[in-house]
Amino acid sequence: MEKRNPREWLCLNRTVRFGETDAAGVVHFVELFRWCHETWEESLEKFGIVLKEIFPSTQINTSQLDVALPVVHCEANYFQPLYVGDTINIELYPEKINESSFVLLFKFKKNGEQIGTTNIKHVSINPITREKCALSKQINLWLHESGLNF
């Protein structure tokens, strides 16, 4: 398998859109978490993981998935406001905690300056019993490869 640079699937650029701002004209706080999930999904896709094999959808019965990955903790820090038209870079730093959990650390940058951070902890559970279980092979590989040379 060809060695790839994790930056290929762990960095995303985006532009702030009007619908993502509040009445004061700045990005609504919840948008950071939406951007985190979008960045994570795009990262998995760029790595080669088929999203419908990881996330439940109307096309797949949840019981057909081997694991579910609910969020059990999240937090965000906002250092500067963002406005419509701002271009930002989102960097994702995944870290495996143990055999059943991992955290996604995100850094938001504008013109090279850090303007926000988030961390989101996921736990792997059996979707039927809701008991903790081991992370899937796909997620384990993504976590391992994401930690190399970044």
UniProtKB/Swiss-Prot annotation:
GO function terms (MF aspect): 1,4-dihydroxy-2-naphthoyl-CoA thioesterase activity
Signal peptide: none
GO biological process terms, semicolon-separated: phylloquinone biosynthetic process
Catalytic reaction equation(s): 1,4-dihydroxy-2-naphthoyl-CoA + H2O = 1,4-dihydroxy-2-naphthoate + CoA + H(+)
Metabolic or biological pathway, per its Swiss-Prot or TrEMBL entry: Cofactor biosynthesis; phylloquinone biosynthesis; Quinol/quinone metabolism; 1,4-dihydroxy-2-naphthoate biosynthesis; 1,4-dihydroxy-2-naphthoate from chorismate: step 7/7
CDD domains reported in the protein's UniProt record: 4HBT
Protein name stated in the entry: 1,4-dihydroxy-2-naphthoyl-CoA hydrolase
EC number(s) on file: 3.1.2.28
Keywords: Hydrolase
Native organism: Prochlorococcus marinus (strain NATL1A)
Entry superkingdom: Bacteria
Active site positions, chain numbering: 22
Cited InterPro entries: DHNA_CoA_hydrolase, HotDog_dom_sf
Role, per record: Catalyzes the hydrolysis of 1,4-dihydroxy-2-naphthoyl-CoA (DHNA-CoA) to 1,4-dihydroxy-2-naphthoate (DHNA), a reaction involved in phylloquinone (vitamin K1) biosynthesis.
